[in-house]
Amino acid sequence: MDALWPILCSPDKFTNCELSSIADAAIDAFDANWVENGFTSMKDMGPDEANRLTPRIPGVALEMLYEYIEARTKMLLSTDFELLAVEPPFAVPLDPDDETLFYVGRLDKVFKYRGKIYVGEHKTTTAYKKDGPFRANFLDSFSPNAQIDGYLHAVHMLYGEKAKAVWVDAALVHKTVHDGFSIIPVERKFAQIDAWLWDTRRWVDVVETEAKIYEDIGQKADNLPYLPAYPKNTNSCMDYGGCPYSSLCKMWGNPEGQDCPSGFVEERWSPFDELKLSELGMKDAKDE
């Protein structure tokens, strides 16, 4: 969608043949990213691998793109619509009493519609309903929703009174149904965003408390039968296709001092680098 939206929002007029070529170019970008993440290119994928991964494969994505262009072109070319940014990073304050605490992330899309500012958030699901096309539990999952509420906080901080809502641009991923799309508008009252702020700051306190406990344990952690810091949330182990580290939890009571097992790589994850926060003029604390 990052490649598609700027093209569709341009003032150029496209023939059906040109729109088809745009979809092909977008799927080429998708396929390149697909390969970069360790999967087989759509051009080289055999039937066994395709059946194993279906419906989340490039071929289905291409069919969806054709339908998506037809479904969204009218809105994106409307004179009421203006695309402002694609994947912009953001950093907004979380606590007026702590100038070092920021909520950071990236927004899928930011656009102006009829004078108001919206965040566009792309979501896919396989939760198909014959007369839907989406199941009710998927449609209801965005309010309340910590991620969406966080984006609402961010857009209000960035754009003030012009900020309006998050539009969840939902797409059904299905083997044969390729035209399942819906825009789910999410607005929240300021009191509800304030509740999200309190929840978030509470979780920040929890993480910082655990970090302090871990720091105090120090090198003694290697000799303990379990790690008395950062408690597990075992009710979430199977969410989003399953936690990739669940096998390590089954293997060890305490991961400290263990050799990195085959198939895993130990590396530093930096949200600063991942989100490209340097674009905002920010500096990574590790460089100071």
Please annotate each region the language model reported.
Residues M1-D12, F134, D140, M157:
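An N-terminal domain-start capping segment
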Residues D2-E87, P93:
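A non-catalytic, helix-rich entry segment at domain boundaries
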Residues F14-N16, D95-T100, R114-K116, Y159-K162, ...:
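Short, solvent-exposed loop/turn segments that connect beta-strands within catalytic domains
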Residues E18-A26, E49-I57, F81-L83, F102, ...:
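Glycine-rich, flexible loop segments associated with nucleotide phosphate handling
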Residues S20, D24, L83-A85, K116-E121, ...:
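Short, well-ordered strand-loop elements centered on a beta-strand within folded domains, enriched
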Residues M75, D98-E99, K232:
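Residues embedded in well-ordered secondary-structure elements
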Residues F81, A85-L152, H156:
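Non-catalytic protein-protein interaction segments used by genome-maintenance enzymes to assemble
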Residues D140-S143, G150-E288:
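Metal-dependent nuclease catalytic regions and adjoining charged, substrate-binding loops involved
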